[in-house]
C-alpha cells in the first residue's frame, strides 16, 4: 500500500494541521509529513501549485490531492469505512457530521480571541465578550453529546471525526485557563490523555521556541 503525504504547518500553532493529522491517524494511515512555513513566500508558491487554497492540511494519496479538513475526513472514510471514523448508527452519524461542520465553519470569535499555542500557559487571560457565546455553544455541544452517547469521547468510548475537529479547541481552553463546566473540563482531559494527542503535543514541544506567526487561520 502506497504511503500518503500530508502537508502541515507548525504543530504548535496550526489547529488545522492538527485536525488533518488526527483524521489520518484515526483512519489508521501513517503519513509522510511535509512541513511548510506558511509565511515563507517560496513555500507558499510551491503549495499553490499543489493546493489551490494555499492552506494546510493537504493530503496527497495515489494521485488524489485533498485539501480542507472535512474533505479529508470524507475521503478517508470512503477508503477505510471499517475504521469507525463516524458512529455506526445513522442518527448519531448525522449528529457527528453536523457538529463537525459547525466547528469547521463557525466560531470565528473564539479563533481570534484564543489562538492555538500548545506551549503557552496563561493563568489569567481576559476573554473578550464576543468569544463568550462561542464558548457557551461549544460547552453545550459537548454536554449534549456526552450525556446522549455516554462519553468519554463525544460519541461514546471511541474517538470519531468530531473529536478530531474539536481537539484543538480543548487545547485553546487549556492554554488560556478558560473556566468550563465539569463535563467540558472532563472532556478536555479526555482529549489531553488521548495517545494521538499526546504524540502531537510531544512533537510540538520539539519545535523551535520562537517562530514567526504563521499566515494561516488558526
Regions found by a protein language model. Give the residues of each.
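GST-like domain detector, emphasizing the conserved glutathione-binding G-site
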Residues: 1-128
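Short Asp/Glu-rich motifs
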Residues: 43-44, 192, 210-211
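Short, contiguous strand/loop micro-motifs
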Residues: 6-8, 34, 157, 174-175, ...
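Tryptophan-centric aromatic hotspots in well-structured domains and transmembrane helices
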Residues: 15-16, 21, 67, 86, ...
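Acidic/histidine-enriched, glycine/proline-rich intrinsically disordered or flexible terminal extensions
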Residues: 204-218
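GST-like fold's C-terminal all-alpha helical module
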Residues: 103, 107-196
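Residue-level detector of family-conserved "landmark" positions at structurally sensitive sites
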Residues: 34, 69, 183, 201-202
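Conserved beta-strand edge residues that scaffold enzyme active sites
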Residues: 37-40, 187, 205
Amino acid at each position: 500500500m502506497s504511503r500518503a503525504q500530508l502537508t502541515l504547518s507548525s504543530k504548535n500553532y496550526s489547529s488545522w494541521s492538527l485536525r488533518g493529522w488526527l483524521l489520518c491517524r484515526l483512519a489508521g494511515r501513517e503519513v509522510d509529513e511535509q512541513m511548510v512555513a506558511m509565511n515563507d513566500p517560496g513555500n507558499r508558491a510551491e503549495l499553490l501549485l499543489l493546493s489551490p487554497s494555499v492552506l494546510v492540511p493537504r493530503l496527497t494519496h495515489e494521485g488524489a490531492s485533498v485539501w480542507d479538513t472535512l474533505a479529508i475526513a470524507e475521503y478517508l472514510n470512503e477508503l477505510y469505512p471499517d475504521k469507525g471514523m463516524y458512529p455506526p448508527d445513522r442518527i448519531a452519524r448525522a449528529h457527528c457530521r453536523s457538529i463537525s461542520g459547525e466547528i469547521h465553519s463557525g466560531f470565528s470569535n473564539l479563533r481570534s480571541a484564543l489562538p492555538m499555542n500548545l506551549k503557552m500557559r496563561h493563568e489569567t487571560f481576559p476573554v473578550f465578550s464576543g468569544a463568550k457565546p462561542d464558548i457557551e455553544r461549544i460547552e453545550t455541544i459537548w454536554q449534549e453529546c456526552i450525556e446522549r452517547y455516554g462519553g468519554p469521547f463525544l460519541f461514546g468510548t471511541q474517538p470519531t471525526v468530531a473529536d478530531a475537529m474539536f481537539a484543538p479547541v480543548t487545547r485553546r481552553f487549556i492554554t488560556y485557563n478558560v473556566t468550563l463546566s465539569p463535563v467540558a473540563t472532563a472532556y478536555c482531559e479526555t482529549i489531553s490523555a488521548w495517545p494521538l494527542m499526546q504524540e502531537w503535543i510531544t512533537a510540538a514541544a520539539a519545535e523551535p521556541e520562537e517562530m514567526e506567526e504563521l499566515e494561516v487561520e488558526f
